[in-house]
UniProtKB/Swiss-Prot annotation:
Domain of life: Eukaryota
Miscellaneous comment as given in the Swiss-Prot or TrEMBL entry: Present with 2140 molecules/cell in log phase SD medium.
Region described as Disordered: spans on this chain: 113-140
PANTHER family attached to this UniProt entry: ADL329WP
Record protein name field: Uncharacterized protein YPR063C
Disulphide bridges, residue numbers: none
Compartments, as annotated in UniProt: Endoplasmic reticulum membrane
Stretches with biased composition (Acidic residues): 131-140
Residue spans crossing the bilayer: 91-107
GO terms under cellular component: endoplasmic reticulum; endoplasmic reticulum membrane
Annotated organism of origin: Saccharomyces cerevisiae (strain ATCC 204508 / S288c)
Positions annotated with a glycan in the UniProt record: 36
Segments of skewed composition (Polar residues): 113-122
């Protein structure tokens, strides 16, 4: 038998799962967490559809890539940071931001027309008052 024979039982090694090491930045909040937390609110205030879709995609990405240790910490009410929100809340906020941006399709708002008669009357009155004062000073 050759040494490279795969069928030999002494060459078989069972698989042992090894957890990857924690990264340098895993314990500290990153800039993506700040952006992920503030984008849904920016979409709500600005009613910008691009920002709303961006926040939804980013929240789904954060939700799918959240570490299991962080989820367990949230369930035990031991969040890594007091300002950090659970991934489900971030996803819910981005969905609300998207709904607010498209709310005009369900509840359209009428644009107020400027009244043309009110502004002309005020302008004419001001001109007449000015000419009356000028004529009175010219007579004296």
């Amino acid at each position: 038998m050759t040494l490279n024979n795969v069928a030999r039982p002494d060459l078989c090694v069972s698989y042992k799962k090894i957890a990857p090491p924690k990264g340098l930045y895993s314990a500290t909040p990153s800039i993506s967490g700040v952006v992920n937390q503030s984008m849904p609110m920016a979409a709500i205030f600005l009613r910008n559809k691009f920002i709303a879709w961006f926040s939804l995609i980013q929240s789904v990405h954060y939700y799918l890539n959240t570490d299991e240790d962080i989820i367990v910490a949230y369930k035990e009410n031991k969040a890594p940071s007091p300002m950090d929100q659970p991934p489900a809340i971030k996803l819910f906020m981005s969905l609300i931001g998207l709904c607010v941006c498209y709310m005009n399709l369900v509840f359209p708002q009428q644009i107020a027309q400027p009244s043309s008669s009110g502004s002309k009357g005020n302008t004419e009155t001001t001109i007449e008052t000015t000419t009356e004062v000028e004529t009175e000073t010219a007579k004296q």
